[in-house]
Amino acid sequence: MKLKNLYIENIRSYKKLDFTFEDGVTVISGVNGSGKSSLLEACFMGLFGSKILSKDFVLADMIFKGAESAKIHLGFEHLGREYLIEQAFRYSLKSENASNSRCVLFADGENIVDQATRTYEEVCALLNMDEEAYRNCAYIRQGEIDVLINAKPRDRQRMIDDLLQLGKLEEYRERAGYAKTAVRRLERDAKNSFLGVKAEIEGIESTEPVAAVNRLRQKVKETDAILEELNKKKEFAAARKGELDLRIAEYRERLQEIEVLKQAIRKSQEDKAACFKEKETFSEEVQVQRRVLLELGEENSGMREECGFGDLEIEALLLQQEKSESSAREKVNSGSKELALLLKEEETGVQALRELEKDKVETERVLVECRTSIGAANKEIEGYRANIKQLEEENKRLREKAGFGAAGEIASVIKELEEKESLLRDRKNEVSTKLGFALKEKESGDASLRELDSEMQSCRVAVSKGKSEIEALEKEIRDNSKAVLDFQEQKSEVFAGLKALGFTEEQLENLEDFNELLLENKNRLHGKEKELEVTLREIENTLRKNRELLAEGKCPTCGQELKGSGIACTAEECEEKKEKLSLELADIKLQRAELEKKLNRLKEAKKLEKQAYDYDIEIEKLLEKAKASEKLIDTHRTRIEEDSLKLESSGKRKQELEAAGSKLLLDIKALREQEKAAQKVHLESEKALREAKVFERKLAENASEIESLNGKIRTSLALIENYGQRLGELNEKLKAFAEKETQSKEKLEALELTLETARKNEEEAKKAHIESARLLGEAKKLQANLLRMQNIKHKISEFEAGIGNLAEKIGFFDREIVERSDRIRQLEGKLEGNRLEELQQKLARFEEAQVNITEKIREITAEKDTLLKEIGMIENSLKRLKELKEELKALENKRLYLEAVYNNADELENTYMRVRADMRARNIGALSILLNEMFSFMYTNNAYSHIELDPEYNLTVYRKDGTPLEPKLLSGGERAIFNLVLRCAIYRLLALGFGGDRPDGLPPMILDEPTVFLDRGHVRQLLKLIDMMRSIGVGQIIVVSHDESLIDSADHVFQVEKDPLTNMSSITKI
């Protein structure tokens, strides 16, 4: 595999980068933090996606800060095909989380996978390794220089087995073990099912089902014969019953017809009687109507004579009377209208007369009011003039009392008083301000004295408390010293116990390493013990089979004698191998027992070491506590000194404040006396000013009142003049009202005469209309009587026709009665006396017989159904018996098959175990050779002879004198060399094909800062190591380093730089 191209956007410190990889050795250099390792991480992430991230490093950390999306496009060549992986990521600023938004794998330009998980699986399948195996084989990350060294043997075994594809064999062995367990479970279930089926078969056969079925079938045949005979009897009874039913039905029909005929005769007779009755009613009604007709004729003749209608036809008479009534009604209406107009005119005149009288009264009232208002105005004028005279006299008295002459003198005096009052007020305010400042200063001094007293009291309390704290802390220090001595004695006892167990104080630091080594040895012995036990079981099985064959003497296949053959020799070799393995197994068990004792001793030593550690912690805590107490004592003493100095300065300050306060008291007393005198003078000035202003205000008010009264007098004189004009107008108006009243009264008298004449005319017209209306009503009544006479005549003719129809009906009913009576006699002649009862008795006997036969058939049928049900159950049992026998045979075959499968799975599991152990041994041997070869090539110091890699992947370094040493106990530089050698050895082993891969299918080697712990000599050896890896077929080697020698020897060199302003990295080829 070779990397071809890397295109990234917004990954770590790279905003955008398009980088092409070259064959050979490529060195990437740059200052710390420039983004070299980020470039390798981008390649790693391009291959395996987010699977490379650890728990402390999330996907969002890979995206450039502030970016919302990122891309990685990685192109590579593998086994002759061109591949391209496109990864895209999306970052949410809101949730601050990132996710994979696109993951596509192209092969030779064709899209083969387009989902993150599937792409990851496809890449793992292509490379035959996942991200962890890639790190352990080809990618040595910065900070993971000794991962394989520090790993536990079990983890190291898993890592290397996965790289060499041995983990598949372990997986297959586990699958075979699971299959064996499952087959054993199925075999047990099949055996239980076999026993259950067998027990069920025996239970069914014990009931003799075939004989029982034959007996029941014979009983069914007998029951069928009885049912056939009963069904014949039932059919005969049913036939006889049917005949009787028909005869009885016919008899009943005839009886029913006779009854119907009799009812019809009775109905005809009733209808005939009803017709006779109705005929008589019609005859009586004809006589009544004829009497009414005669009365109406006589009434019409009387009306004609009374009203003078003569022999005129009723229509002409009605027309004449209607015209007369209409003419009279029109005369009444015209008279009523004329009368209404006259009445309305009279009402209008009366209303106008009333309005004139009302206006006259109102005018007279206004006239009286005007005369009254003129008198009142004259009285007000006299009052106003009296008030003016009184106010003028009051003003004169006020001026004489105050000693003022003109109004100008009053204003000048008030101005002088105001200026004097202002000067006195300013003086009073000045004295009050000085007094306020003095009082405030006195209050501030008193507050300062109180604060000083409080502060001095706090200092005294703090000094007392500090001395108490110092005494308590000194006592605590003495107690801590005593406790430290006690813990040191207990610690000495613990070290004595450790010495008794054989551990020195210097060995306590390595107890965990000893414990881990012992546990690893224990696990290794346990695994070896299990392998030996499996091998011993296989040998015993082989011996048992060989002994059985030897006991028979001949080969069961070819018949050849087995004595002295290869089987006999193999049996002897197996016996010897068994004895040897048994001794080895016993030796391993002894070693395990010895390890258990060592582990117990180590466990006790760890307990004691923990106690000693706890005592050290307690002693350290007590010493720290003592130091803290001493610091507190020093602090308290310093504070006591500070508080004492503070007390002294506060005392001096208090004396100064008290002296200043005494002086202020004298000043305040003098200022209060000055303030009192100023207030007295100011009050007298204010009083004089107020009295002057009162005089001035009173004079001004009186002048204003006089002016107001003069205005009112002028107003009253104007009102009197207006009222005089109004009186003239009202007198003229009263004269006009008198003339209008006289004219209205004359007009009303003329209307009264006209109204009397109109009322007489209306009364005469009404009388004439009443008479014409009466005659019209008589004519209409005559018309109604004539119409009623016509209706009566029509009714009489209808009644006479009805009487004829009823006579015909009566003849029809007589004929009907005769015909039905003849039919009844014929039907009664066909009946045979009282034979119906006899037929009914026979029918009852046949019905009873039919019911009995049916009940017996039902009972026998139920018995037959029971027999058939039993037969069905037994037949089901026979069918079940057949099925169970087939199932029993199948279960037997299944059990034998599962037993064979179990044996095959057991043999397969053992085979996988042997193959894995064999392949692991071969790989370990090859890896050990390569490891020592490269270690001797790489390591320039001659302090170590070789490295041992045991079957459990435990690594041990041996010194020249043969002393073994754990790799983790090597120095940092030695561990770095050891790690490089181990990684390169694994890579070489994979290149040789032990893992099943072709050499050109391996990924490029990537070394991130491999020279961190190496000196100059080992750096030169690293260059040779890189050349060696190139010689075995590694097409690409990518190194991140600052070392100049690596840079000089590289085929391609790139420089990575980061812009400090934008924090973005860039790469250039050198």
UniProtKB/Swiss-Prot annotation:
Sequence positions that bind Zn(2+): 555, 558
InterPro entries recorded: P-loop_NTPase (IPR027417), Rad50/SbcC_AAA (IPR038729), Rad50_ATPase_archaeal (IPR022982), Zn_hook_RAD50 (IPR013134)
Domain of life: Archaea
Entry's cofactor comment: Binds 1 zinc ion per homodimer.
PROSITE patterns in alphabetical order: ZN_HOOK
GO molecular function annotations of the record: ATP binding; ATP hydrolysis activity; zinc ion binding
Domain Zinc-hook: 508-607
Cofactor: Zn(2+)
The keyword Ribonucleoprotein is annotated on this UniProt entry: no
Keywords for the protein's UniProt record, in alphabetical order: ATP-binding, Coiled coil, DNA damage, DNA repair, Hydrolase, Metal-binding, Nucleotide-binding, Zinc
Binding, ATP: 12, 32-38, 142, 969-974
Segments forming a coiled coil: 227-257, 369-403, 449-478, 570-614, 878-908
Classification via Pfam families: AAA_23
One GO biological process term: double-strand break repair
Subunit structure: Homodimer. Forms a heterotetramer composed of two Mre11 subunits and two Rad50 subunits.
Domain notes from UniProt: The two conserved Cys that bind zinc constitute the zinc-hook, which separates the large intramolecular coiled coil regions. The 2 Cys residues coordinate one molecule of zinc with the help of the 2 Cys residues of the zinc-hook of another Rad50 molecule, thereby forming a V-shaped homodimer.
Family, per entry: Belongs to the SMC family. RAD50 subfamily.
Function, as annotated: Part of the Rad50/Mre11 complex, which is involved in the early steps of DNA double-strand break (DSB) repair. The complex may facilitate opening of the processed DNA ends to aid in the recruitment of HerA and NurA. Rad50 controls the balance between DNA end bridging and DNA resection via ATP-dependent structural rearrangements of the Rad50/Mre11 complex.
NCBIfam families: PRK02224.1
Protein name stated in the entry: DNA double-strand break repair Rad50 ATPase
Name of the coding gene: rad50
